[in-house]
UniProtKB/Swiss-Prot annotation:
It is found in: Membrane; Cytoplasm, Cytoskeleton, Cilium basal body. GO terms for cellular component: ciliary transition zone; cilium; cytoplasm; cytoskeleton; membrane; MKS complex. The gene is Tmem216. It comes from the Eukaryota. The chain crosses the membrane at residues 15-35, 49-69, 82-102, 115-135. Pfam families: Transmemb_17. Coiled coil: none annotated. InterPro entries: Uncharacterised_TM-17. Part of the tectonic-like complex which is required for tissue-specific ciliogenesis and may regulate ciliary membrane composition. Keywords: Cell projection, Cilium biogenesis/degradation, Cytoplasm, Cytoskeleton, Membrane, Transmembrane, Transmembrane helix. The lineage of its organism: Eukaryota, Metazoa, Chordata, Craniata, Vertebrata. GO terms for biological process: cilium assembly; non-motile cilium assembly. Part of the tectonic-like complex (also named B9 complex). Interacts with TMEM107. This is Transmembrane protein 216.
């Protein structure tokens, strides 16, 4: 743990977590509406639609847990929760990549939304690694 007079938490990382939390909530609701649109108006195979919606629900769980551990690790200056968040960044980025590239139908709106999610994942991963390095360097002093 860091000395009491040192604050090592990353403010830019915390801002990204906050913004990503709100963005992901909006993304999730829009994606549900898009799946409703696809299911009603496009010849979307039922099995694929169900699979994509179930994967979206799993993605919601992964993202909520990732943001929770990232925020707690950053604010409490703990390496373990921040490390869990780093580990969950990879499945999160893979899910965003799936929705960007591998769905049956990818709308332009989805491509834009998933590109923004990938930008958030990459930025957060970079800042998480820098923050973990800062926490580790202060443990040695």
């Amino acid at each position: 743990m860091a000395p009491r007079d040192k604050r090592l938490s990353s403010t830019p990382l915390e801002i990204l977590f906050f913004l990503n939390g709100w963005y992901y909530a909006t993304y999730f609701l829009l994606e549900l509406l898009i799946f409703l649109y696809k299911g009603l108006l496009l010849p979307y195979p039922t099995a694929n639609l169900v699979l994509d919606v179930v994967m979206l629900l799993l993605y919601l769980g992964i993202e909520v847990i990732r943001l929770f551990f990232g925020t707690k690790g950053n604010l409490c200056q703990r390496k373990m929760p921040l490390g869990i968040s780093v580990a969950l960044t990879f499945p999160s980025a893979m899910m965003a990549s799936y929705y960007l590239l591998l769905q049956t139908y990818v709308l332009r709106l989805e491509a834009i939304m998933n590109s923004i999610l990938l930008f958030f994942c990459g930025s957060e991963l970079l800042l998480e690694m820098l923050t973990l390095a800062t926490f580790s360097s202060m443990d040695r002093i």
